Amino acid sequence: LYPDLPGFIKELHQRGIKFLGYTNPFLSTDAPLYAEGERKGYFIKDKDSGAPYITSTTTFPVALVDLCNPEACSWYRNIIKKHMLGIGMDGWMADFGEYLPPDGELFGGLDPYLEHNRYPVRWAQLNAQAVEEAGRGNEIVYFCRSAFTGSSSQVPLLWAGDQIWPLYTT
């Protein structure tokens, strides 16, 4: 789609245009980063098999980064710093964060039911920390869909998510 995305972003910047990207805490099972995350144990696990908990948010299988695991958070922050901030992005949509599986196994044995509302806060914190660690605090705008008490101090903008739901269109 963009054979030289950093070059394209630089060209846009020269024209006074900002570039926003997209991220979420799911990784496609076909993505190269998935293999690394699986090898390091950075995904929420299936309680029965201990393998990554595979689900689908759209049309393809994905695993969810276990944001209860400090090492997984550090890994994903570094991905954001390298692959988004490092190529010149000016911000992004930090999507999802609300789909913590209630039957998954979390790092440290934490209860998914108790962590359900904390997960969006952890997602917002991860994004905020990536921006701060990169030294770009006031230059970057990112926005989250999911939130809970404490999220607003971690994210510059919140959006209400997708407002079209088939139940209400009939």
Task: State the predicted function of each range.
Residues 1-170:
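Catalytic-domain carbohydrate-binding cleft regions of carbohydrate-active enzymes
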